[in-house]
Amino acid sequence: HQCQPYNVAHSYRGPLQFRIWEDKDPATQEIVAYRVYIGTYMQYRTIWMDGRPHPPEHAPHTFIGFSTGRWFGETLTVTTTHIKKEFYRRSGIPSSDLTTMVEHYIRHGNLLSHVIIVTDPVYLTEPYVNSQEFVLMDRGNQNWLYNCEYKMEVPMDQTKVPHFLPGANPFQDEWAKKFGL
């Protein structure tokens, strides 16, 4: 399963390259959507900007989900639903198909801040928040293909759901400890 993509909440984490481009209505030149190519796992994503509603609850779920966006000043805010259940981390924090994600894209010159806020009523007791900075690199039409090699990274018993009892999660304050917060 290692070459199968993570869900969208984890797709932007780590070193990667991605592209964003506009999809315009040919008659009006209004932006209908932003298309996103995420080099890791070669995923293509659409962020609909035309005001369309999210599909009904029983509609198919995908690793990339169904996304709609709106501009608030200089910030693009994206809401994603219909995300296939997967994991938030390689260590095994699971996600459910009730996961929703709100993203904020904020550009500062050649830097792009990407902030996600994930809610999951099944597995999360509070929102999962993560952020990452990207640097604009002008490489013309060059992009990398994702070469996947299968390796056993985290051996897991397929009959168990990874979990920690209340107060026993060793990852709860890992970032605070690492950065002395």
Positions of the model-derived regions?
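PEST-like low-complexity, intrinsically disordered acidic/proline/serine-rich tracts
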Residues: 1-181
